Amino acid sequence: MDKGISKKIKIYIDSVAKNQQWLISAYLFGSYARNQQRAESDIDVALVIDGLNDNDRFEVQVSLMLLASKIDNRIEPHPISKDDLNSSNPFAVEIRRTGIEIKLK
């Protein structure tokens, strides 16, 4: 993966962690994690959030997207609860299967 992209992902995750105490972990997944990205690919980042529930999901998503847009418009945040990440949901399975954990500060 391009070092510039790696740096942008790290800046984004550090910004989220700094502003949101509820971030448990983060994973790069999708085409960038599989090293199959194209010029038009987005940068999928799963953000595991403590206590995320369906009532808050939209508001959290918007907040994460606004922060991502300040760093790189290709960053596509995907908030997910710890319980959902450990479920058999195909989305969660994809994150666990191909995801690369991004270290938090």
Identify the function of each model-found stretch:
Residues F29-S31:
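Glycine-rich beta-strand-to-loop/alpha-helix junction loops that act as flexible
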Residues D44-L47:
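Short beta-strand->loop micro-motif that forms the acidic, two-metal-ion catalytic signature
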